[in-house]
């Protein structure tokens, strides 16, 4: 069966009252980005639903693109016919024939908002149901638990029919809750944190710290590939790759070994916060899980957070490793994350890092070195790319030089 459109039902948008229009607009924007390589697709957003007009594009590919988009409760491939009963009958029969199985059951659920159509909802149910039964053997009616539910929506602009409902990703449209910077390493936790933030409508821009020659091009590419996995939830992800070698070397030379990780994280957070300011972000997201490593104790978090007043969102803070791994496997980032390429969080790691660093001592150690000039240099040399779901590739950002 060739479908000419897809009907999208909204998720939590139904509770957003006066702000509903901006949520619908944002969802339409994300859907458009996800359909970037389907040029004939057209999107029509209405108050209670959205239509994707396929114009000959592959409906199966369009369905795959819609499945991970946050803000969609469910969607159905559909066909539109004119307000003629014979056309409705023929389309209904073709739809049910396409999906029914031997000795299957079905139900017709009609809704008529266009009052000039000659039949009311109950009459449509009876007329179409009888026609389908007459033309398909070994098919029976079950109104409570049917194998196939044929929905018919009679509107002024035509009659819309569908018989398959696909569950969407739910949540809020990415970008509807504002923008945040995701500190994206090559590990398991940070992609999961990014995914969970996106589910609540946060548009993430990934920040990855690259320290060649200590970290390889493969490690950098792994981070880009992880960003591509996250891009499918909103259509694309902007990624900032920060040259971090000089800062890490200076930390290793000037800072006591036991607090190297604390100072390293502080420098990362300073850079991320400055990027957030330039990119008009509202928060920073990271993959910290309380007590998992030395830099993720409450005392360490306190010392690290002291460099900023920006909200730090930690979606996985209360999860254990197994819970995080389960989500990573679900979103298809786990196999990438466990590839054995070192990132800047694992180089220069001391054998016995402090789990309860003192902020006053940390600040004193840092005061003997001009880290600010190194941070400025790193910010001036950031590489910014855009990672697209449709291409799974990277495009150098034309505005990167603004940093």
UniProtKB/Swiss-Prot annotation:
Pfam families according to UniProt: ThiI, ThiI_fer, THUMP
Catalytic function, reaction form: [ThiI sulfur-carrier protein]-S-sulfanyl-L-cysteine + a uridine in tRNA + 2 reduced [2Fe-2S]-[ferredoxin] + ATP + H(+) = [ThiI sulfur-carrier protein]-L-cysteine + a 4-thiouridine in tRNA + 2 oxidized [2Fe-2S]-[ferredoxin] + AMP + diphosphate; [ThiS sulfur-carrier protein]-C-terminal Gly-Gly-AMP + S-sulfanyl-L-cysteinyl-[cysteine desulfurase] + AH2 = [ThiS sulfur-carrier protein]-C-terminal-Gly-aminoethanethioate + L-cysteinyl-[cysteine desulfurase] + A + AMP + 2 H(+)
Compartments (UniProt record): Cytoplasm
Domain (THUMP): residue spans on this chain: 60-165
Pathway(s): Cofactor biosynthesis; thiamine diphosphate biosynthesis
Protein task: Catalyzes the ATP-dependent transfer of a sulfur to tRNA to produce 4-thiouridine in position 8 of tRNAs, which functions as a near-UV photosensor. Also catalyzes the transfer of sulfur to the sulfur carrier protein ThiS, forming ThiS-thiocarboxylate. This is a step in the synthesis of thiazole, in the thiamine biosynthesis pathway. The sulfur is donated as persulfide by IscS.
Similarity section: Belongs to the ThiI family.
Protein's recorded name: Probable tRNA sulfurtransferase
Organism: Listeria welshimeri serovar 6b (strain ATCC 35897 / DSM 20650 / CCUG 15529 / CIP 8149 / NCTC 11857 / SLCC 5334 / V8)
């Amino acid at each position: 069966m060739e479908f000419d459109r897809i009907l999208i039902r909204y998720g939590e948008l139904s509770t957003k009252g006066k702000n509903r229009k901006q949520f619908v607009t944002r969802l339409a924007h994300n859907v458009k980005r996800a359909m970037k390589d389907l040029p004939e697709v057209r999107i029509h957003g209405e108050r209670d639903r959205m239509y994707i007009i396929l114009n000959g594009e592959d409906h199966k590919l369009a369905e795959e693109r819609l499945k991970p988009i946050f803000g969609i409760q469910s969607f159905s491939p559909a066909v539109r016919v004119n307000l003629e009963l014979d056309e409705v009958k023929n389309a209904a029969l073709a739809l049910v024939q396409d999906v029914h199985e031997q000795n299957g059951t079905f139900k017709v659920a009609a809704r008529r908002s266009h009052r000039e159509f000659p039949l009311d909802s109950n009459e449509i149910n009876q007329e179409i149901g009888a026609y389908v039964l007459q033309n398909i053997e070994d098919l029976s009616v079950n109104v409570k638990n049917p194998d196939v539910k044929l929905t018919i929506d009679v509107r002024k602009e035509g009659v819309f029919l569908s018989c398959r409902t696909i569950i969407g990703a739910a949540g809020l449209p990415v970008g509807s809750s504002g923008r945040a910077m995701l500190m994206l390493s090559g590990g398991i936790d940070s992609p999961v944190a990014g995914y969970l933030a996106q589910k609540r409508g946060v548009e993430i821009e990934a920040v990855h710290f690259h320290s060649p020659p200590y970290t390889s091009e493969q490690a950098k590419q792994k981070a880009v590939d992880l960003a591509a996995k996250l891009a499918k939830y909103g259509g694309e992800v902007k990624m900032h790759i920060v040259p971090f070698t000089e800062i890490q070397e200076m930390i290793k030379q000037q800072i006591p070994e036991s607090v190297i990780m604390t100072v390293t994280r502080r420098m990362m957070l300073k850079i991320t916060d400055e990027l957030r300011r330039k990119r008009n972000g509202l928060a920073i997201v990271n993959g910290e899980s309380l007590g998992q490593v030395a830099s993720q104790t409450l005392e360490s978090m306190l010392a690290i957070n002291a460099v900023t007043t920006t909200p730090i969102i930690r979606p996985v803070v209360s999860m254990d490793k197994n819970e995080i791994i389960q989500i990573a496997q679900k979103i298809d980032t786990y196999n990438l994350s466990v590839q054995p390429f070192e990132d800047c969080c694992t180089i220069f790691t001391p054998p016995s890092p402090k789990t309860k660093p003192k902020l006053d001592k940390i600040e004193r150690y840092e005061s003997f070195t001009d880290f600010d000039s190194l941070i400025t240099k790193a910010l001036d040399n950031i590489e910014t790319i855009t990672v697209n779901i449709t291409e799974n590739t990277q495009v150098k950002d034309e505005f990167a030089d603004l940093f």
